Amino acid sequence: MSSPEPQGEPQPVSGSPSEFLRNIVGKRVKVRIGSGVDYTGLLTCLDGYMNVALEQAEEWAGEVKTAAYGDCFLRGNNVLYISALEDL
């Protein structure tokens, strides 16, 4: 009796968080960090530690835009959530 051959990496379940994160790379997102500050911008990179790289980034405290950056790097342990600002 032979065992089935490995099929490579397992595919994420449709609608899973890992699929969502893979689909938002290259899209405009909002990232909230632990201090309550939001960053919006184009998600260019995301890794397994939730480290985030944004381009055309803006920093928001509530409804007030406090800064604009060309590039912004957020350390994953500060990230509370990431939400898409455009349709996937």
UniProtKB/Swiss-Prot annotation:
InterPro entries: Lsm6/sSmF, LSM_dom_sf, Sm, Sm_dom_euk/arc. Its main location: cytoplasm. The keyword Magnesium does not apply. It is found in: Cytoplasm; Nucleus. GO terms for cellular component: nucleolus; P-body; sno(s)RNA-containing ribonucleoprotein complex; spliceosomal complex; U4/U6 x U5 tri-snRNP complex; U6 snRNP. CDD domains: LSm6. Disulfide bonds: none annotated. It holds the Pfam family LSM. Keywords: Cytoplasm, mRNA processing, mRNA splicing, Nucleus, Ribonucleoprotein, RNA-binding, rRNA processing, Spliceosome, tRNA processing. It comes from the Eukaryota. Residues 16-88 form the Sm domain. GO terms for biological process: maturation of SSU-rRNA; mRNA splicing, via spliceosome; tRNA processing. GO terms for molecular function: RNA binding. Belongs to the snRNP Sm proteins family. SmF/LSm6 subfamily. Component of the heptameric LSM1-LSM7 complex, which consists of LSM1, LSM2, LSM3, LSM4, LSM5, LSM6 and LSM7. Component of the heptameric LSM2-LSM8 complex, which consists of LSM2, LSM3, LSM4, LSM5, LSM6, LSM7 and LSM8. The LSm subunits form a seven-membered ring structure with a doughnut shape. Component of LSm protein complexes, which are involved in RNA processing and may function in a chaperone-like manner, facilitating the efficient association of RNA processing factors with their substrates. Component of the cytoplasmic LSM1-LSM7 complex, which is thought to be involved in mRNA degradation by activating the decapping step in the 5'-to-3' mRNA decay pathway. Component of the nuclear LSM2-LSM8 complex, which is involved in splicing of nuclear mRNAs. This is U6 snRNA-associated Sm-like protein LSm6. It comes from Cryptococcus neoformans var. neoformans serotype D (strain JEC21 / ATCC MYA-565). The gene is LSM6.
